[in-house]
């Protein structure tokens, strides 16, 4: 028992260390990828109204007048929970209250070491609005969309997988498999355009669904926001098509494999009806690969919602990324990509912990 606990602890420690290195690699890649792009960030911030003095002031304020290596160190310092800050007001790393929410740890002669929330900097195009605030306002909508999509995928995918397995080699089975293949191969942006046009425009009189819309919309008087759940239906269905197709295939194949096991034959020999055999023994023992698929797909949906959100006008993080790309708003792009990567890593760690808890072989390997 002690050996198992030690193996599990070592496993989790190794996963945490590997994840930190992965996150560091992602941060480095994001920084250098966007800093080799053509264009001057200071000019992007000022637009067409800049003059030489304004340009110099902005470059000094945001550290754009420093070398790439120095800017990289500034970027790491901004993102790190424990960071060093100069006591000189003219220095980029000066501890400004409007930039950092920090707790002082150690005060030195020329620097202060603090504990803070990661600082993702400010938007180029939104009048200095904090990137963290933009993400805080849009990420919940993306999470709601991803959760809705995965719920749709689980319910319909498992149901279709069971029907397909029970009616193996029938026309219904072949039709479900064909639909699954199409669902897995169909790009999400094409599905979004097709669904928005057909259900939101052609059949609008019957469905009452709109081509675009978000979770919260202003009322007719422009006084308050109301929840519009019907705007969630089309984007959630479109985003859930691919995981639905995968889950239905996994459920079908696993259920067929389970139904050929010896204990299923024993249950049949005892006189249980086929319905009870499938319900009590088949389905329960076929869900492991589905759980695996769901945990992996949920992280993918957070990143894959970009085009779906933009096409349906869903005010989530994906739509914000596309808008930032159109406006060359680099801090918003970098911060959003970094948050998505961080969520990927966290979800993968949680999945590995679940595996280690469920399957002893993971603890030993």
What does each model-identified segment do?
Residues 1-67, 137, 154, 163, ...:
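N-terminal signal-anchor/first transmembrane alpha helix
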Residues 18, 26, 152-153, 180, ...:
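Transmembrane alpha-helical core residues of multi-pass small-molecule transporters
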Residues 4-5, 65-154, 158:
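An internal, D/E-rich "acidic patch" concept
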Residues 8, 12, 16, 54, ...:
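Hydrophobic alpha-helical segments of integral membrane proteins
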Residues 30-36, 66, 179-212, 238-244:
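Membrane-water interface segments at the C-terminal ends of transmembrane alpha-helices
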Residues 9, 139-144, 148-172, 188, ...:
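Alpha-helical transmembrane segments of integral membrane proteins
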Residues 45, 88-89, 121-123, 191-192, ...:
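Short, hydrophobic secondary-structure boundary micro-motifs
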Residues 23-80, 84-100, 203-225:
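Hydrophobic alpha-helical transmembrane segments of membrane transport/permease proteins
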